[in-house]
């Protein structure tokens, strides 16, 4: 790539930084713009739980985690798969390991060492950063506009990567304000909604005060024909956790159709209904209902939940406990967002069809995935793909013959 060509990367999260690295390695002069005081804030936030980079499951199973977007994201994920992400981390001195659930983490179990080494590498590649630069859109002549502490700033790069993320972590820069900007130039954006988020339940004060923050372990949750086994967490205003996040799309679809969602919980997935009924029938004389439920292996929070919803203490109810979910919790509390720039608006290299030279990566695109390493992996993979798309664009532009002047 011609080193005189300049690329602007807007957004200093994982998608933006890997795009910057990819482009700098190809010889471009890259500047990363971010509204925060430093880049990498969202990457650091992802590291709070150990930095789940990706997942080790077979690729064909892995790709299905992206639901309707699986075929769309597949080329990017195949070009930069989980193995490539792990090799990239190792190249920065951070080896990875596979946890018992198949999730992949750095051995350090923190984001800080990896981000520190990454920023050093980016500096060595000549990538520069301009922080406290909030994007305002484009000027009438096509320049990028930013507001900064020193005033307004404009620039005209040879290509642009947009990688602002969704709207789920405003305190680290993902505010979703880009939606109005790109919509104003005719780009279709599917509304951003909470994904990997909790849902509101109308708990009684007694249940809320006693069990908010208590995990509901080893349950199976179902909604609209979808079923997931895992763990949930009772919250002050509802329920969240890995099993709930995995059903998010089904729950939101039910809410859009019916106004609320009927979640069903199997409180004892290890026992069939028949076996559970048999054990309940052997209830000892003098046992209270709670004691009987405890004897069949239910936890205190599961027993309280059965009481909370007023379900009869029989096997059929304990295997399919009804819980009405009223709405998603605030988007500010979501781990990620669904929605984004519509698939129809970008080409095979994630370039905007209506704005040649502008490419999109990460959560700005209209896809979603459960927790487990799938979110970060797709951000990295689409960041690499968008960068390579920008490489092709500037190469084509620089090689195009120009008309001789008159």
Where are these regions (language model features)?
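Core beta-strand elements of the Rossmann-like FAD/NAD(P) dinucleotide-binding domain
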Residues: 3-5, 149-159, 228-230
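N-terminal Rossmann-like FAD-binding beta1-loop-alpha1 element of flavoenzymes
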Residues: 5-32, 390-391
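Short hydrophobic core segments
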Residues: 8-10, 33, 135, 155-170, ...
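An anion/pyrophosphate-binding glycine-rich loop and adjacent beta-alpha core
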Residues: 22, 31, 36-45, 59, ...
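Conserved N-terminal/central alpha/beta ligand/cofactor-binding core
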Residues: 35-128, 133
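A glycine-rich dinucleotide-binding beta-alpha-beta segment and adjacent secondary-structure elements
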Residues: 131, 299-368
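A conserved short coil-to-beta-strand element within the FAD-binding core of flavoproteins
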Residues: 131-143
């Amino acid at each position: 790539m011609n080193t005189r060509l300049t690329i602007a990367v807007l957004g200093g999260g994982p998608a933006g930084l890997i795009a910057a690295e990819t482009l700098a390695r190809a010889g471009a002069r890259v500047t990363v713009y971010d509204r925060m005081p430093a880049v990498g804030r969202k990457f650091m936030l992802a590291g709070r739980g150990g930095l789940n980079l990706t997942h080790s499951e077979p690729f064909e199973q892995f790709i299905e985690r992206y639901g309707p977007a699986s075929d769309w994201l597949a080329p990017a994920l195949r070009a930069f798969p989980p193995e490539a992400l792990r090799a990239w981390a190792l190249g920065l001195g951070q080896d990875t390991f596979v946890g018992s659930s198949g999730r992949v983490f750095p051995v350090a179990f923190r984001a800080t060492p990896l981000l520190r080494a990454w920023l050093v590498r980016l500096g060595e590649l000549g990538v520069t950063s301009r922080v406290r630069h909030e994007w305002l859109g484009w000027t009438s002549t096509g320049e990028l506009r930013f507001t900064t502490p020193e005033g307004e700033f404009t620039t005209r790069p040879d290509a642009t990567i947009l990688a602002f993320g969704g709207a789920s972590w405003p305190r680290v820069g993902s505010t979703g304000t880009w939606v109005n900007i790109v919509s104003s130039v005719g780009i279709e954006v599917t509304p951003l909604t909470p994904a990997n988020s909790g849902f509101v339940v109308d708990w009684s004060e007694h249940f809320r005060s006693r069990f908010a923050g208590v995990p509901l372990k080893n349950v199976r949750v179902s909604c609209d024909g979808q079923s997931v086994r895992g763990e949930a967490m009772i919250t002050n205003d509802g329920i969240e956790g890995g099993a709930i996040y995995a059903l998010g799309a089904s729950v939101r679809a039910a809410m859009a159709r019916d106004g609320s969602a009927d979640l069903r919980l199997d409180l004892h997935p290890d026992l069939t209904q028949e076996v559970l009924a048999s054990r309940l029938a052997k209830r000892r004389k003098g046992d209270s209902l709670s004691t009987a439920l405890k004897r069949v292996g239910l936890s205190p929070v599961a027993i309280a939940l059965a009481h909370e919803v007023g379900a009869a203490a029989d096997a059929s109810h304990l295997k399919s406990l009804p819980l009405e979910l009223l709405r998603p919790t605030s988007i500010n509390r979501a781990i990620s967002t669904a929605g984004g720039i519509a698939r129809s608006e970008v080409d095979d290299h994630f370039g905007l069809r209506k704005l040649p030279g502008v490419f999109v990566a990460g959560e700005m695109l209209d896809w979603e995935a459960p927790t487990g390493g799938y979110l970060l992996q797709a951000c990295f993979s689409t960041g690499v793909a968008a960068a390579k798309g920008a490489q092709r664009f500037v190469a084509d532009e620089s090689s195009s013959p120009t008309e001789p002047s008159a």
